[in-house]
Amino acid sequence: MSAVVFSADFSSERQWVAGRSWAYPDGGPTNQGDNKLDHLTADSAYSRLGTFRARRRADGLWDAGLLTTEGSAEGFMVRTGDHLETTVRLPTELGAWPAIWTWRDGGNEVDVFEYHPDNPDLLELTNHVRRGQSYVRREGVRPGAVIDLGVTFGRRSVVWTLDGERIFADGRGVGSGWQAYLIVNLSVCAGRYHPAPEPETVEMSYEVRRLLVTRPLGGYLTDDDPPEVDWPVHGPAEEG
């Protein structure tokens, strides 16, 4: 049994801080060392309606939307054993780099997903805490598609699902004491690893229609993860 402990209201300033994150050098607004053209903005039009936007600036960077629970009044953190579910509409423009991920104290990063439209059918799923990763290709993943993603942050294995199907279990997990803040954002690629936006593109977006986190009632009573968290690594995940 589990209970909902977080249901995203992107308009809530108690839940979310807009336009800055300590995952960026000095809290932002730029992170060009990570091949990003982002110039983070707190303008509500870029994130607070659940549509995360980026618009080209005269200086070559892009005003970009980012929300994080870090520094908010509620300060919500996901922790070991939590399960996150989200519904997103993927972007269509080359150079768009949407992501939902976690961060705390210079690390604790797990990428719920990253996506690049130049690899139209591929999702990037990464556990940076213990170095588990998969590149998963699916026919239902494509620019503009609406997909349901789930992640269970298990002690011994982080498990991802797509539209209800398990697609990857990393067999590494996040450990027993892990916790981290949520980040939802749209970055813009600078061209090193994926194409930069085409010259005629001036705006891009993706949509997060739903995001919630559930937690086992009463926590874990033993040192073992529940069975659904400890799925084996083998399965339909495809390494790319």
Predicted feature residues:
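Short strand-turn-strand beta-turns centered on an Asx-Gly dipeptide
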Residues: 161-165
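Short, aromatic/His-centered strand-loop micro-motif at the edge of beta-sheets
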Residues: 126-148
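Localized edge beta-strand/strand-to-loop motifs within extracellular or lumenal beta-rich domains
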Residues: 143-159
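Low-complexity, Ser/Thr/Pro/Gly-rich disordered linker/stalk regions
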Residues: 1-82, 212-240
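Short beta-strand segments enriched in hydrophobic/aromatic residues
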Residues: 54-58, 90, 153, 188, ...
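Secretory/extracellular carbohydrate-interaction modules
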Residues: 52-122
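Surface-exposed coil/turn segments at beta-strand junctions on protein surfaces, enriched
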Residues: 79, 142-144, 177
